[in-house]
């Protein structure tokens, strides 16, 4: 069963932890790709200098952050990669969760082809570990791009999260990645991951 709007309507830090173990579903050419969410980061615009919406900053790019909980915010980085976030709390609050890593579950050959243009059996050990172990890596592997920006995960048939009961794990809380510019916010323990999962991007 897919997650509903009510599930997403909570503090980003709470949602980031509760999304761990849930399953991201992405339909590509009629084939459903599935991956367990194993790493997330929370961003809270009002108080978070690492957020694109810090201090109420509002631009055309960041407008999805102010949308309804359950909306996708997909942004472009380094001129070639995408990152996928899910909006949380309430409309206008600019809170969201970055999906940092997935554990591939279903249709892994297509996931592999999208990521490396190879069958999964052709991948070396390094490639297998890195297939979805990072925010831009999972976007490549699950064909998530700017077309998915603003997509409503509560209504979409091609991008949503399933409420699957993978809950037998310990959650690690630590600092977020790549935000050294964010002053005191770089020390917030707002990154969450499943302990000992092989697909976590940074431990």
Swiss-Prot record:
Pfam families: Pur_DNA_glyco. The keyword Flavoprotein does not apply. GO terms for molecular function: alkylbase DNA N-glycosylase activity; DNA binding. It is an enzyme of class 3 (hydrolase). InterPro entries: Formyl_transferase-like_C_sf (IPR011034), MPG (IPR003180), MPG_sf (IPR036995). The keyword Hydrolase applies. Keywords: DNA damage, DNA repair, Hydrolase. One of its GO terms (biological process) is base-excision repair. Signal peptide: none annotated. Its EC number is 3.2.2.-. Belongs to the DNA glycosylase MPG family. HAMAP family: 3MGH. This is Putative 3-methyladenine DNA glycosylase.
């Amino acid at each position: 069963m897919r997650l509903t709007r009510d599930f997403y309507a909570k503090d980003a830090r709470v949602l980031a932890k509760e999304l761990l173990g849930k399953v991201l579903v992405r339909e590509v050419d009629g084939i459903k790709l599935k991956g367990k969410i194993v790493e997330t980061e929370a961003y809270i615009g009002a108080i978070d200098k690492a957020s694109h919406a810090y201090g109420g900053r509002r631009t055309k790019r960041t407008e999805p952050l102010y949308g309804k909980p359950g909306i996708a915010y997909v942004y472009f980085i380094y001129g070639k990669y995408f990152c996928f976030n899910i909006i949380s709390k309430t409309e206008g609050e600019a809170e969201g969760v970055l999906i940092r890593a997935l554990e591939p579950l279903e249709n892994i050959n297509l996931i592999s082809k999208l990521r490396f243009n190879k069958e999964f059996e052709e991948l070396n050990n390094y490639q297998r570990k890195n297939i979805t172990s990072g925010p831009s890596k999972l976007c490549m592997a699950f064909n998530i791009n700017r077309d998915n920006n603003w997509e409503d995960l509560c209504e979409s048939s091609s991008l949503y999260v399933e409420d699957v009961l993978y809950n037998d794990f310990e959650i690690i809380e630590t600092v977020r990645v790549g935000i050294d510019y964010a002053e005191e916010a770089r020390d917030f323990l707002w990154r969450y991951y499943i302990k000992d999962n092989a697909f976590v991007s940074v431990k």
